[in-house]
């Protein structure tokens, strides 16, 4: 991390960038938050560790409107989102200085809680320079030790790879964390009967409190004005009118980002209710791969997505209906 801070200070000092977009410590050891740093002194508060899971690419939409370049720290999976935003003309590549930061998997504090680890005071073993094999957690109830991989976010177990798709320079080593099939959970749901699927999603989506965290964190949700904020559609309220409305919110949002979602997993990571929202998007990704050939949104900043282009080899719409 010190190398990252030192380089950021250099780029600020020589005028290459006007600000740095990274993370600073939050009020809890597992809760770093996104922050801008405009002076060398402020960078002393910069942090980067296993809990810095937030995808900063969406914040570059507003940063692109500011004077001067913004240095932004992007993990390998974040760079897919940035590429997709370039493709959609939502960010200005010339206004960004991208430092690709190493990643050895990001941590999910909810997994720690499910293990019964509470009252956390400090955590070691999650720094960029660590091997990220063992986590040592100090709590008010005593010390706990666990395997790093047991506390990783779901998305890290199905990682797309540790190669940065776009960058100006790379700092820090990455580590392969993939140990599961990306579509295993989707296939499990596909095998359910229609009644079982309905019951599964009814149970999960009934937890929704309509906080809009998923939409606000999602890089693919980049509309200047969201349809769900329009008073014309009676959907500006935060509390649900009925359970059906909440189901439609998530289903419609999934349709809106289909073909553009990079599967960054931010929707599920930020959900305070623990709803696996990424499963909707991953189902679309799986179907797109099946019908149009394997495609990864954000793998580059030029190619057209399968849902925004046409070829004579495209699957006929009836095939989807026949499959059921």
Where are the regions that the model predicts?
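Iron-sulfur-associated redox domains of electron-transfer enzymes in respiratory
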Residues: 1-201
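Generic structural signal for well-ordered, non-membrane alpha-helical segments
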Residues: 1-5, 211, 264, 277
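Short secondary-structure junctions and interdomain/linker hinges
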Residues: 15-18, 89, 211, 215, ...
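Active-site-adjacent beta-strand anchor residues
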Residues: 72-75, 208, 270
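Helix N-cap / loop-to-helix initiation motif
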Residues: 78, 214, 276-277
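Short alpha-helical basic/polar micro-motif
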Residues: 80, 216, 269
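Cysteine-cluster motifs in flexible loop/terminal segments that predominantly coordinate metals
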Residues: 149-166, 208-214, 221-226, 264-267
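Ferredoxin-type iron-sulfur electron-transfer modules in oxidoreductases and energy-metabolism complexes
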Residues: 178-206, 220-324
